[in-house]
From Swiss-Prot:
This is Trans-aconitate 2-methyltransferase. One of its GO terms (molecular function) is trans-aconitate 2-methyltransferase activity. Its EC number is 2.1.1.144. GO terms for cellular component: cytoplasm. Catalyzes the S-adenosylmethionine monomethyl esterification of trans-aconitate. Belongs to the methyltransferase superfamily. Tam family. The keyword Metal-binding does not apply.
Length: 257
């Protein structure tokens, strides 16, 4: 799946707010390295650096375009290309921070268990994931993909990512006598200029696997059909703007000292 740092950055303030909210719940760190997993263009990495300037910090991402943007943004930091599904976490780490990346990995709970085992005493795993598959933005991606003009491109392929497990699953799998786990949902309501802005937003994330699956000759048609559905699903308010509802799931797991 391809990513575009420039497209992602169009709504950077809105995308960064959940990272700020997540970081606010991270306690003081012990000695040890910190990692921004799925660092993207470095917006979340920048927050971690400001909060924990004394911790050795590395950003990990699988996309070269995102890594290039992150290195430009924070030239003195270390950024590495890595597949989080296969990445081996260093032992005695102080922080694994992940803003909007693990929703793409179906077996992420198992990965969380592995990350927690690599934490130093007092270390924290902090995760935020979009939990928006039941929102019109994502339901309409599937509906548009099922139209006769586009269905052949998606035949036999699963594009829609898997729904997140229940909050109880995370607590039951991750919490123990040695690990405290906090889980919560936050619903953000983003005021955007119009319905086209919603389309531009999801072009940077959720819509990308759908567009990647289509021949280049069909992408404009798919976007036009999708945009028409979005305009109906998100009518303008009295001020002319639209309100994008965006639920997100947060997890903070900290090993006892």
């Amino acid at each position: 799946m391809s990513w575009s740092a420039a497209q992602y950055a169009k709504f950077e303030d809105e995308r960064t707010r959940p990272a700020r909210d997540l970081l606010a719940q991270v306690p003081d760190l012990p000695a040890g390295p910190a990692f921004d997993l799925g660092c993207g263009p470095g917006n979340s990495t920048e927050l971690i650096l400001a909060r924990f300037p004394g911790s050795p910090l590395t950003g990990i991402d699988s996309d070269d375009d995102m890594l290039s943007a992150a290195r430009t943004r924070l030239p003195d930091l270390r950024f590495e290309r890595g597949d989080l599904a296969a990445w081996t976490p260093p032992a005695e780490s102080a922080l694994f921070f992940a803003n909007a990346v693990f929703q793409w990995l179906p077996e992420h709970v198992t990965l969380f268990e592995r990350l927690i085992l690599a934490l130093a005493p007092g270390g924290t795993l902090a995760v935020q994931m979009p939990d928006n598959l039941d929102e019109p933005t994502h339901l309409l991606m599937e509906e548009t993909a099922e139209e006769s003009a586009f269905a052949p491109a998606f035949a036999g392929r699963t594009i829609r990512r898997r729904s997140l497990p229940s909050p109880a699953t995370y607590v039951e799998r991750l919490a123990s006598k040695e690990v405290r786990v906090d889980v919560w949902h936050t619903v953000y309501y983003h005021q955007l200029a119009n319905a086209n802005a919603i389309v531009e937003w999801v072009k940077g994330t959720g819509l990308r696997p759908y567009l990647d699956a289509l021949p280049t000759t069909q992408r404009a048609g798919y976007l036009a059909a999708y945009a028409e559905k979005i305009r109906k699903a998100y009518p303008a308010m009295k001020n002319g703007r639209v309100l994008l509802r965006f639920p997100r799931l947060f997890i903070v797991a900290t090993r006892n000292l």
